Amino acid sequence: MNRFWPPRPSHTVLSVSLPAASPLLGSFAANSLRRVAQIAEIIRGYQDLAPDERNDRAKEIVQLRHAEAAAMEACADVLDCDASATCLRLRAEALRGGSWPERVERCIGLDETRLISLSGDLHTWHNKSREVFHSALFAAVDRRYDRLVEDLDGQIDALTCYIQTTLNPRLIVRPPALFKVGNLIFCGGEANRYPKHFAYFLPEDEGIKRARMKKTVVFANVYSAIYHGISAPFGSSALVLEGDDDQTAAPSVKDYLICWFRGHDIGHGVVLPETDFRVLGQQGRAASMMLQEVMADLFGLLLVSGGPWSGLANLRSDVAVKVFLNEMLRYLRRGETYFPDAEAAFLELSFLELNGFVHVDFDRRKIMTSVERVLSGVTQMLTLLAGTALANDVEGTKAVIDRYGSGARAQFSSKFRASFGQSTEVLDYVQTV
């Protein structure tokens, strides 16, 4: 299988240096984890062999998995965080043949304060392959963002009131998945191929569906590198945001990314009492996924551009909107036929453009709007989707897709692609002990 996705004539590789692991974890732990990532690369390479060749390597692959497990257990012995050490040991047991679902699910509820660990089977991009492939990832927990997310989550009741007042008094917020933020230090296997993931949804991305507990893991350094290396440069050339002042000091963009993504996570659980996503599934799996991503994206922006989070995290609506638009355009330029997130980004831009909240000048390659127009459009879009997709209105939801989706607006999609091109940038990690 090609290391790169989606298919492109060429890719632009951006080199990103991951933090040195020894100052964070100590030399012994760092070298142990580097060994795991290196072994994961070998195992993943064997998975690309023809079936007969792979079978010939079966015994060696088992030995390699055991070597990974031994290195993870050695690291666990020197960590000063019981939860981080327990996760390593549970995943080591799974690599040796222990019950995979049982051990992985036990890891989900752990509150690591030093190290986030993933190893073993992991999904890749949905349209790249439906199979799971071998990976190993390790990230140092970012305690500042851990505390920030804890503070944000403490505002759920206030968020619910804000959403009800802004959109619909019948909307409720389901308890969100657990959330852990770290800075990636080692990566091997399928996860080290292209494009890189800045987040994983566990244990679903490990092939375990309908788990009792779920956790979102975000790599803040990777997310920031994607934004500053891909999203922001394109946005600065194409986006004209009325009143934007690059000279005005603003909090770290990384704060906005983490807060928006937590808002996105929470947005997946904003529903009406009667919402049944099986009804939404009648639109087809791809359309259902796309609409759920649209709503999560928009709820995320709503939460970081106003309401209780703004004061708590010192967030400004103008910066929040700019970051959101830059990310929306990055997702869209990946190609809506390859990623549900890109299809969602297309519908978002399509709605904003068709209803006059955004103007796209294809000749000048400019996308023009204002903070106020975007927020007004987002509120209108969420109100529409709450009354259709969340209200189990099959015909109303179909009408939204038929009016704003890429199938209905093929000419707009084609003109956008011809004018603004598609993203070819991917990250490559420089990993050091």
Walk through the language-model features, giving the residues of each.
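N-terminal helix-rich structural modules
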Residues: 1-104
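Contiguous, non-catalytic segments that form substrate-binding/exosite surfaces or channel walls
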Residues: 66-246, 253
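An active-site-proximal "capping" alpha-helix that borders the catalytic cofactor pocket
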Residues: 81, 289-306
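Short, glycine/acidic-rich hinge or "gate" loops at secondary-structure transitions
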Residues: 84-88, 171-177, 279-281, 309-323
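Extended, compositionally biased alpha-helical segments that mediate assembly or anchoring
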Residues: 144, 391-433
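Active-site recognition of the HExxH zinc-binding catalytic motif
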Residues: 256-273, 296, 301
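Post-HEXXH active-site segment of zinc metalloproteases
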Residues: 272-294
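Long, well-structured alpha-helical subdomains associated
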Residues: 301-403
